[in-house]
Each structure stands twice: as C-alpha cells, then as structure tokens.
Amino acid sequence: MIVIDDFIKDQQLLDDLKNDKTFFDTKGYMWWDGWWNSPANTIKKRLIQYIWGENSPHPSVNVQGFEYWIGVYSEYEERDELPFHFDKDEYWYNQTKEIVTPVIGTVFYPWENDIDGGYREIYPHGQDGEPERLEPKYNRLVIFPAGAHPHRVTKVTRGTRRAIAINLWDKVPSGLEVGELFLEN
C-alpha cells in the first residue's frame, strides 16, 4: 500500500477540484480508456492523468483504462458507510461467479472532510485481522490492491465524506458492454 499526503502539487488542479461544484454529483461507474487514447477533457480525467501519468508513485503498469466513481457518505445521505468488499468486475461475477479483479486501486480525497468516522479500513490479513485504518484526509492519495484485500468505509456519524475511487484494469470490465459503466463527457 502507498499513502501520500499532499500529493497534488499543481495548485491550479487543486483549485479546479475545489471550485467544481458538480464533481460529486455524478452517480454510477465511469470508464476512461486513458490519455493515450482520448483526451483528458473532464476534471476527473485530468485528475486520473495527474495521478497515473507523470506523477505516479507506483511502478508503471500496462492497463486498458480506468474505472472510476464517486463515493459520498454521510449521516444525511443514502449511504453512511460501505460494507466489507473487494473490487471486482461485478457484471462478470454476477454472470459467471468468476472473480476478475483490477490491477490496482486508488482512492483520492479532493475536498476537505470535516467528519466523524468515514475511515478507509483495509484488511491485508482478512476480515478477522487487524485493519490498516486511514483517515479521509484532504489531498491524500491511497494506492492499494483493491481486488486482493477486503476493505470498507466505516460509518460516518457527522459530516460528509467525499472521495474518488479509481481502479486500473488490464482488461476492459464487462460492464462497459452492457451499460453498467458509462463514458464521461
């Protein structure tokens, strides 16, 4: 696992993230085939390119693209926590019961989170082991094997927790073909 605080050094990108009032409005899972195939024409794609392009703290990986989504958890929202899970191609799993996982997972916190709870807990030794517990801290980047280790978000009891999750795939997830992932414009 890699955890880097104050990851983004580009002040313009940080300001653009802070000022984009619609960043967390997008519901559902998105797909981008990467800057080598199509332009980074949205703020989310610019963020992905910043993290996984020239600023990547992780060794280079060969991928087909990026699955990404927004996580908003609050005592006032539909969801106040995220239960134990590991990331996988959900559509493929539901069709075949075969588990296909991403190459690596990413979580980034682009806004301040004045909250109680909402910790990301990663269980590298299984759900019964001790978790690695991470506070949802502004401008923090977390890179971890999202398909290998169970993880969750603990209950938010005050405030709203906001993050973007990004999975890197060496094969396009099957959900794209059936509309479970969409292309962000």
Where does each model-flagged region fall?
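Fe(II)/2-oxoglutarate oxygenase catalytic core
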Residues: 1-141, 148-185
